[in-house]
Amino acid sequence: MSETQSWSSVLIALLAREDLSVADASWAMRQVMTGEATDAQIAAFLIALRAKGETVDEIVGFRDAVLDHAVGLPVNSMALDIVGTGGDRFGTVNISTTAAIVAAGAGVPVIKHGNRAASSSSGSSDVLAALGIDLTLPPERVAEVLRATGITFAFASAFHPGFANAAAVRSQLGVPTVFNILGPLCNPARPEASAVGVAPLDRVPLIVGVFQTRGATALVFRGDDGLDELSTTGHSHVWEVSRGLVTEHDIDPRDLGLPTAQIEDLLGKDAAHNAAVVRAVLAGQEGPVRDIVVLNAAAGLVSYELAADPSRVQEPILDRFRSHMAVAAEAIDSGAAVSKLEEWVAATR
């Protein structure tokens, strides 16, 4: 690509199937975030990029630009995000959202970052609204809620106003774009620990690579069934990222004492139904949904512990999961998780 950054040089490079540098990728995304790019330029950029195939350096540049233009969310302590990319097309209940509440009930500060539905029957924002949480809070109130309760929700559209500049184009294109990858990587609080479920297998190296390049701590995972969660229907693959190193693991839920579930056991409906499922699980209802929630809450706790003490990576991952599954289960059975939800609802009112 030429030394002078312009849409012409960016598009010529992409059409020639040349990868962009971090700096050039960041320049292009800044044009989108600031509203300087036209709809035609955005559409050409997104399609040419998708046709070529994104690289880790490009995603790093895009992420840096998005976060540079995000509304800040100051945090005074270590925090965790539990999120899924969506796109698995199963329409499950809100597993990562429920797991986030359980993790907060276990005492870990959680900053959930999300948007409208992608693969669940209702997205994290939809089900949280149905649970009674006010999602229209200004950014400073979002931070206050975290300090008061230990959990909060950063609505992507509120903290990334620049996303709106590409919204119409994305809707008209109707195909997945780089923005589908960026969501889980752009929590405005920049939490130290992440647990990220990824549905498309070809997206895993990109997301893992971004965490690795930036020296972040994360557990990235997908079910062999295609879920963007740690699955209980069969094996899951886990990529553990810490201090620039990646360790791969295979997780069989049976090794953790969990019975094998059927995907039908995990399917959701609309936001009201899914909110009722969340409340039932937090109230102690047993069954397949509780099992998968406990497993995914444990993933968040494992990541948070690893961020605090990177030497934990040397310990067997199944041992770490067993330990944190017990913590997650206790958060439910003691009533701490459902109490955390009620605290959260009250704090947003």
From Swiss-Prot:
The residues the record assigns to binding Mg(2+) 2 are D228, E229
Summarize the protein's role. Catalyzes the transfer of the phosphoribosyl group of 5-phosphorylribose-1-pyrophosphate (PRPP) to anthranilate to yield N-(5'-phosphoribosyl)-anthranilate (PRA).
Positions binding anthranilate 1 in this chain are G84, N115
Q: What class of enzyme is it?
A: transferase
Q: Which UniProt keywords apply?
A: Amino-acid biosynthesis, Aromatic amino acid biosynthesis, Glycosyltransferase, Magnesium, Metal-binding, Transferase, Tryptophan biosynthesis
GO CC entries: cytosol
- Record text on subunit structure and interactions: Homodimer.
- Binding, anthranilate 2: R170
Swiss-Prot/TrEMBL cofactor(s):
Mg(2+)
Its UniProt pathway annotation is:
Amino-acid biosynthesis; L-tryptophan biosynthesis; L-tryptophan from chorismate: step 2/5
Q: What is its EC number?
A: 2.4.2.18
Query: Into which family does the record put it?
Result: Belongs to the anthranilate phosphoribosyltransferase family.
- Stated name of the protein: Anthranilate phosphoribosyltransferase
Q: Which biological processes are named by the entry's GO terms?
A: L-tryptophan biosynthetic process
Residues annotated as binding 5-phospho-alpha-D-ribose 1-diphosphate? 84, 87-88, 92, 94-97, 112-120, 124
Upper lineage ranks?
Answer: Bacteria, Bacillati, Actinomycetota, Actinomycetes, Micrococcales
Q: Which InterPro entries match?
A: Anthranilate_Pribosyl_Tfrase (IPR005940), Glycosyl_Trfase_fam3 (IPR000312), Glycosyl_Trfase_fam3_N_dom (IPR017459), Glycosyl_Trfase_fam3_N_dom_sf (IPR036320), Nuc_phospho_transferase (IPR035902)
